[in-house]
């Protein structure tokens, strides 16, 4: 995925921000690039190179792993383009009809450029895990 960016040295603002975009779906589960993309007036855009694999272990269990390599879309003065890498893992289990249990784990390794344009400390370990129980009963049904 590619979101154009702005070098910040002109009179016009040229960065693209997908209003109401589904950032979580496309830019990693950790949501580093979700709402307010960057800090301190930076708007370098985003380039996400992603590779993933999905494996169906059985009729009821599937797993997915994705690797994201994030860079800025434009070269900023005195900064490298690399923002960091993220790995996302998710497992889904269809417990019964209309009930699914999902769990996931993600971690991110940022760079010095990430510190400047997003804030934070790239040397600290960034990770999170989650568990979700989804119940989707069919309440109303009609045949026409």
Regions of interest found by a model, annotated:
Residues 2-4, 65-69, 103-107, 135:
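Transmembrane beta-barrel strands of outer-membrane/channel proteins
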Residues 9-17, 74-82, 113-120:
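Outer-membrane beta-barrel translocator domains and adjoining extracellular loop/strand segments
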Residues 45-49, 81-87, 125-129:
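Residues that define the transmembrane beta-barrel architecture of outer-membrane proteins
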Residues 47-49, 55, 59-61, 97-99, ...:
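Outer-envelope beta-barrel architecture signal
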Residues 123-144:
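Outer-membrane beta-barrel "beta-signal"
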Residues 51-55, 89-93, 131-135:
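Residues on the lipid-exposed face of transmembrane beta-strands in outer-membrane beta-barrel proteins
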Residues 1-54, 116:
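Extracellular/periplasmic loop regions
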């Amino acid at each position: 995925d590619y979101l154009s960016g702005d070098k910040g040295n002109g009179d016009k603002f040229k960065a693209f921000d997908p209003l109401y975009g589904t950032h979580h779906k496309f830019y990693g589960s950790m949501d580093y690039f979700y709402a307010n993309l960057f800090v301190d007036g930076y708007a370098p855009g985003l380039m996400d190179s992603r590779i993933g694999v999905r494996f169906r272990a059985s009729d009821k269990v599937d797993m997915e792993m994705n690797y994201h390599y994030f860079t800025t879309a434009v070269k900023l003065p005195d900064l490298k383009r690399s923002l960091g890498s993220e790995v996302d893992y998710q497992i889904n289990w269809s417990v019964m009809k209309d009930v699914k249990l999902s769990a996931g784990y993600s971690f991110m390794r940022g760079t010095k450029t990430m510190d400047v344009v997003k804030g934070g400390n790239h040397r600290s370990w960034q990770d999170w895990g989650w568990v979700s129980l989804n119940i989707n009963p069919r309440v109303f049904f009609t045949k026409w």
